[in-house]
Curated annotation (Swiss-Prot):
It catalyses: 7-aminomethyl-7-carbaguanine + 2 NADP(+) = 7-cyano-7-deazaguanine + 2 NADPH + 3 H(+). The active site is at residues 50, 57. PANTHER family: NADPH-DEPENDENT 7-CYANO-7-DEAZAGUANINE REDUCTASE (PTHR34354:SF1). The keyword Oxidoreductase applies. Keywords: Cytoplasm, NADP, Oxidoreductase, Queuosine biosynthesis. Pathway: tRNA modification; tRNA-queuosine biosynthesis. The keyword Cytoplasm applies. It is found in: Cytoplasm. Substrate binds at residues 72-74, 91-92. This is NADPH-dependent 7-cyano-7-deazaguanine reductase. It comes from Helicobacter pylori (strain J99 / ATCC 700824). It comes from the Bacteria. Belongs to the GTP cyclohydrolase I family. QueF type 1 subfamily.
Amino acid sequence: MTPESNLKSLGAKTPYIFEYNSDLLEAFPNPNPNLDPLITLECKEFTSLCPITSQPDFGVIFIRYIPKDKMVESKSLKLYLFSYRNHGSFHESCINTILLDLVQLLEPKYLEVYGDFVSRGGIAIKPFVNYAIKEYQDFKEKRLLDAK
């Protein structure tokens, strides 16, 4: 049995769920845990709802991480991010929840989430949050200072 055989979404017909669901996230074993690649994932079609007005909010989500023993399966990540479609939450809360869900799933060495949301009322909101294990705290602090 290969590690990929445990993945539910990859290669299967896709049922789209449009209400937040962290159970959609899946991981597979890191084939090179001795290396430290900085992996960037970009979702250009992120949508959630304003919790006050119920109007749709649109943005681009950037996720960067250095894996430890597990890596996120990209189709499951797409389905997870799409599950925010009818979820009412502020931009900052969405970004924080994405980080917490991925940290829980992956237990990475380092992980950051940045949201570049379309401006509303002339104000663009661009939240950034990051996480690191003890050995990567200096990297975390540098990334936080360098965040756009």
